[in-house]
Amino acid sequence: MTKKIGGLTAVNKVNLEIGDDQIVGLVGPNGAGKTTLLNIISGITPPTSGKVSFCGEDITGMKPDRICRKGIAKTFQIAESFPDLTAKECVMIGVLFGNDTAPGMKEAQSQALSILADVNFPLEKAETLNRNLNVVELKRLQLARALASRPKLLLLDELTTGLNPKESKEAVELIRKIRDTGISILIIEHVMSVIMGVSDRIVVLDHGEKIADGRPYEVVNNQQVIDTYLGDFNAF
């Protein structure tokens, strides 16, 4: 896939394959093209060239809502939600409109509460307006809303941003739990301990180009990756 924005090539001939029940970590410096790549896959922005195939079907150019119904859901870097809806109502939107088989309202409410519980959202705040939730709660709500569409592939854009180490560890455990339900995951993270802790493979982008793709410890010992990215991290 290639994406050009004006005179900038944000993503340059990147090939990426995600297997069943696999967690793929996507890392790279700021401006490397990571979020743009997720936006291409989810239909938010079309590629300039190349195509996106999902479950054997070419979904290039489909609108985001249709791609969601095909089985791809996405969370966003900034945890925002409809401020005047409750947490439960927000997840119900995903249950009712995120796929082609919508249940009745009573069942949608039940499913929404179950999904909120699955992501460790405090159920005593299920009727709280989203404007009154804290960052951790908004992150979990955003994840619940994505899961409500029953995706086969989940795209996570910096899920742990704004979380403390304990909360990040809980997020890692939750990501593994989601994968164990049969959902493949493509995750962008700057926290290398998170990426190393959850990923089956790590893909590294730099200036829109893929410079590495392999098992976590192969990638972090790749000299080009160290020079362009990991050199900034004392942990390595």
Residue ranges and their predicted role:
Residues M1-F236:
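Glycine-rich phosphate-binding loops of nucleotide-dependent enzymes
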